[in-house]
């Protein structure tokens, strides 16, 4: 931990088109090697694809997808008397959003569509419909927490 106390959190600016901080955070997650304009192009094209295919506002679809992907519980390793226990803990709200965005981008990258725009659009639409790899990741995380419920009293 730093000697000068905790580092102040930087506030992200809302993006120019959708005026949303969530969209900016998603752009930052998509970005590789500091190429932000490329990441913006990917996301905005993906949103156009979503608008085209669903006929709905892409922001609504994205927010629904994020809601379906954000985990409520996760497990953390805790060492007790020489044994490592997977202790279920509640996920902080800011970490929930971060994990949700990270999983959306991570599993979009693993898809088989030709362009990243299509992959991201399809992963967001799947997540909004409660299907897709990112939602499965959340379910697996919750299952792990449920399976290790017995160690919940080791919470810190």
Swiss-Prot record:
GO biological process, one term: translation
Entry GO CC: small ribosomal subunit
Name of the protein this chain belongs to: Small ribosomal subunit protein uS7
UniProt keywords, alphabetically: Ribonucleoprotein, Ribosomal protein, RNA-binding, rRNA-binding, tRNA-binding
PROSITE patterns associated with the record: RIBOSOMAL_S7 (PS00052)
Family the UniProt entry places it in: Belongs to the universal ribosomal protein uS7 family.
Domain of life where this protein originates: Bacteria
Disulfide bonds: none
Any GO molecular function: rRNA binding
CDD domains in UniProt: uS7_Bacteria
InterPro entries to which the protein is assigned, alphabetical: Ribosomal_uS7, Ribosomal_uS7_bac/org-type, Ribosomal_uS7_CS, Ribosomal_uS7_dom, Ribosomal_uS7_dom_sf
Subunit structure: Part of the 30S ribosomal subunit. Contacts proteins S9 and S11.
Function of the protein: One of the primary rRNA binding proteins, it binds directly to 16S rRNA where it nucleates assembly of the head domain of the 30S subunit. Is located at the subunit interface close to the decoding center, probably blocks exit of the E-site tRNA.
